[in-house]
Amino acid sequence: WDTMCSRSADLAAFFNANPSITTDAGAVLFGDTVTISADGPWQHLLYKLTGRKWGNLDVENETGCGIVPYTYKPSNLVNAVQWAVGLELLLLINDPWRVFLTTDHPNGACFWRYPEIIQLLMSADFRNECMAKLPAKIKSRITLPEITREYTLYEIATIMSAGPARALGLLQKGNLGIGKDADLVLYREDHDVQRMFSHPRYVIK
């Protein structure tokens, strides 16, 4: 754990040079969540590391899964690096049509916390406020403090809807073309981006 650091810049450079690749970000947010994995031995190790509850079970004798509650803490250096990595990938990959907003729900964070990630992507000032709460020695291990990019609303719509739909071949989804599925979410404009995306005015399907 002492050598834990981000290599997102290297991954993003490779990604940007290879236009045939798509990826999801698997972002992490601080706070309580539950980890679920088919890697039973790792879940047992996580249980040992945290001292939290643990459950492992077989699924139809073909595979298994482990479940362990977990808290990502900004004061924890490893957790802080994990938090930075997902944001770095989203910000350093140039083409929003090929990188998708996810949290590996619920492992990294629950999907209903996406508005928090959206605010982190759209506001460099908010990112800086959050980074100020991290351990001082993290700055040599991550790239995030050097990134000034801020997402536009168009780019947010792309990584959340249009991009995934195109990558999956769901031609009826993710766009407003004639004859396409009219799945719409309308928001009341608000300078607080996290609040705006947390409280849609209308959801139309």
Residue locations for each model-derived region?
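Active-site core of metal-dependent hydrolases
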Residues: 1-90, 95-108, 126
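Short conserved micro-motifs at the rims of enzyme active sites and ligand-binding pockets
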Residues: 34-37, 112-114, 197-198
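His/Asp/Glu-enriched, well-ordered alpha-helical/loop segment
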Residues: 63-67, 76, 83-187
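C-terminal cap of metal-dependent C-N hydrolases
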Residues: 181-205
